[in-house]
């Protein structure tokens, strides 16, 4: 039941989960949300054996084709249970599962680097990030080491929220670019109640978002974008203009990050309210 201080801002347009970090994920109709985000999101990652860092397409010089791998659970994860195996479709369409005894060898061969599949994040995980030569970014033409939240495979926060209003605004600013949800890897896509085309979620920072009857999120900050948004995946081409447009018009931010105040079920079509 909405309270008097809440305002309707739209509805849940789509839900996305990424079982393995930096691989293509799966679109869902409904999902449980816990204090660690969408159930089963980024539960697995590949660890670079040579550095001990988390493998991430943020450094495409090493991991460019990670985005060409697709990961889906073999069955839906359940609260309180061990995560089920994940089916991985390799770039050449070979299908393997995480429970195979030779999975590390298969993935290492496909990537050209020695990796270990893990469901246990280090206490202080790190990844490498390549910064392209795009004006407005914090760094340019360099690789940095970035800290991740302790004992997780997330970049910054457990939930990423994006509105279709932001996607529509970016399309207006750069009509030649293919701005699609897949490029930005959100968990929750909100379709606004109005037809406004703007970076409307910027104004949600510091406020509370309610999804359906149960889930409440605290919007903590903007989501800074990286080179991953420019990389080819599926039928999407490489396009540095995607990131350049975000940098020129919204400080390289697309979407917002959130923490979970109250978990529960969220479903496609659920009303979204802002407090």
Set out the residue ranges of the language-model regions:
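Metal-cofactor-dependent catalytic cores
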Residues: 1-275
């Amino acid at each position: 039941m909405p309270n008097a201080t809440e305002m309707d801002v739209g509805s849940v347009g789509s839900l996305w989960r990424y079982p393995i970090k930096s691989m293509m994920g799966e679109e869902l109709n409904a999902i449980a949300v816990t204090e660690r985000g969408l159930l089963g999101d980024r539960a697995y990652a590949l660890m670079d054996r040579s550095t001990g860092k988390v493998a991430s397409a943020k450094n495409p010089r090493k991991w460019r084709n990670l985005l060409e791998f697709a990961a889906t659970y073999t069955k839906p994860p359940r609260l309180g249970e061990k995560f089920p195996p994940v089916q991985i479709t390799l770039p050449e369409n070979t299908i393997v599962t995480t429970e195979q005894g030779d999975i590390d060898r298969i993935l290492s061969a496909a990537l050209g680097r020695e990796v270990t599949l893990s469901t246990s994040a280090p206490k202080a995980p790190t990844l490498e990030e390549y910064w392209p030569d795009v004006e407005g970014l914090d760094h340019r033409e360099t690789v940095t080491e970035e800290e991740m939240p302790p004992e997780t495979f997330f970049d910054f926060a457990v939930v990423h929220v994006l509105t279709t209003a932001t996607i529509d605004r970016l399309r207006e600013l750069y009509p030649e670019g293919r701005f699609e949800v897949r490029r930005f890897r959100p968990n929750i896509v909100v379709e606004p109640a109005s037809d406004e085309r703007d970076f409307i979620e910027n104004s949600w920072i510091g406020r509370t978002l309610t999804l359906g009857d149960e889930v409440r999120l605290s919007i903590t900050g903007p989501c800074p974008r990286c080179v991953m948004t420019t990389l080819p995946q599926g039928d999407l081409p490489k396009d540095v203009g995607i990131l350049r447009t975000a940098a020129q018009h919204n400080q390289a931010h697309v979407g917002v990050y959130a923490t979970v105040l109250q978990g529960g079920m969220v479903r496609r079509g659920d009303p979204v309210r802002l407090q």
